[in-house]
Amino acid sequence: MLDRNPGSNLADLYRALPVTWASPTMSPYCDDEVKYAVVEHTIERFWTMRQEGLPIAGQKIIDLTTVNGVRVTVEDGTWGLVRASSNKPELVVVVESPVSGARRHAMFEAIDRILREHAEVGAYNQSL
């Protein structure tokens, strides 16, 4: 990177990076026997919301990526990810916003409301 920016030092390159508000990896308990079904339901809910033009976290869904779970992205670039852990009885939830901590929190709350439709989804190991 430095060789492509000969007039800059590492501190300059770091300062030029965009600011984002990212969550830690949050993992609610979910039994191995049901976690994949919970993720599939979450994918279906996001697809339905997108098809019906319903917002998530107050914004239009602009992209859904369904590789190994689901990543939902809204108009302002805020996104949330839900997937099943490959080696623990839990889900993995991550959210990030290029706009603000409030937008990150709104995405987390919206995803959590969908996950809470399943009684099998337990407490998070950490939260925002």
Label the predicted regions.
Residues 1-86, 90-94, 99-128:
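Phosphate-binding and adjacent anionic-ligand microenvironments
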